[in-house]
Amino acid sequence: MLSIIVFGASGDLATKMTFPALFALYVRKIIPEDFQIIGYARSKLSQEAANKIVTAHIPIDDTVGASQKALNTFVEHYKYVPGTYDKPESFEMLNSIIAEKETAPASECTRIFYLVLPPHLFAPVSELIKSKAHPNGMVTRLIVEKPIGFDYKSADAILSDLSKHWSAKDTFKVDHFLGEDMIDGFTAIRFANSMFEPIWNREHIESVRVDFREDFGCEGRGGYFEGAGILRDVVQNHLLQLLTLLCIEEPKSQDAEDIIKCKVDFLKSLHPVSKEDIVYGQYTKSANGKVPGYRELDGVADDSEVSTFCALQLRSEAPRWKGIPIIISAGKGLDRDYFEARITFKRREGGMFPTVDSSNVLVLRVYPKEFIALKGHIKQPGFSRQIVPVTLDVKYPEAFPDTWIHKAYEVVIADAINGKHTHFISDDEVRTSWKIFDDVLDTTGDLSPLPYAFGSHHGPDATLEFFKKRNLEWD
């Protein structure tokens, strides 16, 4: 018997991500037939109202088995329970409700508690779960969502509190980007292809980049973003995780423990980011005045110095990467919308084609459409001896038309069900990643964000100078 208990079940993330992922896993029969899902939150909702929250963002698609009939059956397994996050009696009640359908012996039951909650609630809720809803002899797992902390100090406190009651084996810390199929495949691209590994180093690579650009702003999220900013929102977690998979040494195996060890080793090779290696920006209203600036949004202070853009350089002491520019850029309110990693190889000096003036580039696009592209050169057909640039690419949907490419949350929840940590982050990764950015989290004074108009190509003008100083180009 599998019981999945979703805390924060009336919230936006649970509605848009958690429940659709659970339904997809149900349709694909990854969730066993004998299961129940319990939603828990402070909101006092009827079961009918709670069911509407569950189904609000689940699309019906008969071609993949996600029929209305399947959804109706799925909802029959769902029960909503209102309660507090700080009273033992609420958790005793929850435990009784879970147990009503657990007719098998404890050794044959699994409970997964998924905390889709603000981080300040992780410790008290996890402690009450352990003391009031954790039967002896039963497999019980805890999933916690990002963000884990606001800086190194707060993250360390949260992790320490969690570890008092839950073992690392039973705790699953989500960075859902690790469930993205393209990101999950980075290690295969690197280590399963013999042509890449020999040249994946400072002798042959000019730069490593991760670019995250959004053509929309913070509408509807102003209050959240005021407490986060772009670095906390996506850089310290999602983008750094992607970058780490590009730069690690080869793990001994595909086991989570071996991969995590190599990730931590690389993260520890990185210097803390200095003020000289980062540019912050904040978007103002669009040039035509139709889109409001960040400071004009609900929940945002009139004099806010929260960043909606940043470009930064990481510096590694790892022999493979020492001296190579490692760049992360992320921004909202730009003129394009995509997320990709880019490896630029050094130009070949001399040779029989000295006029070739552009580098080979490997592009790994995560969205909007997953693809792998290698930019190179060939001779133009015909009598000409001219060398022209070409792009060789693999588009995932076209290359795998009959394959269900799972969404990120489906992957991470499936891992938790199976007790695998492959697509989760470790305590060491969380602590080390915060240390890298702690010195540049305060976006006031010298690090005050520079203005750029909504719809800008490159964020603040200082970005262009930032790239020029590093012999790179913004594109």
UniProtKB/Swiss-Prot annotation:
Cited Gene3D superfamilies: Dihydrodipicolinate Reductase, domain 2 (3.30.360.10), NAD(P)-binding Rossmann-like Domain (3.40.50.720)
InterPro entries for the chain: G6P_DH (IPR001282), G6P_DH_C (IPR022675), G6P_DH_NAD-bd (IPR022674), NAD(P)-bd_dom_sf (IPR036291)
An example molecular function term from Gene Ontology annotations: glucose-6-phosphate dehydrogenase activity
Binding site for D-glucose 6-phosphate: K146, E214, D233, K332
Entry keyword set: Carbohydrate metabolism, Cytoplasm, Glucose metabolism, NADP, Oxidoreductase
GO biological process entries: glucose metabolic process; pentose-phosphate shunt, oxidative branch
Pathway of action: Carbohydrate degradation; pentose phosphate pathway; D-ribulose 5-phosphate from D-glucose 6-phosphate (oxidative stage): step 1/3
Pfam families attached to this UniProt entry: G6PD_C, G6PD_N
Catalytic site positions: H238
Protein EC: 1.1.1.49
Subcellular location: Cytoplasm
Known function: Catalyzes the rate-limiting step of the oxidative pentose-phosphate pathway, which represents a route for the dissimilation of carbohydrates besides glycolysis. The main function of this enzyme is to provide reducing power (NADPH) and pentose phosphates for fatty acid and nucleic acid synthesis.
Protein family: Belongs to the glucose-6-phosphate dehydrogenase family.
Protein name as it appears in the record: Glucose-6-phosphate 1-dehydrogenase gcd1
Organism: Schizosaccharomyces pombe (strain 972 / ATCC 24843) (Fission yeast)
Taxonomic classification: Eukaryota, Fungi, Dikarya, Ascomycota, Taphrinomycotina
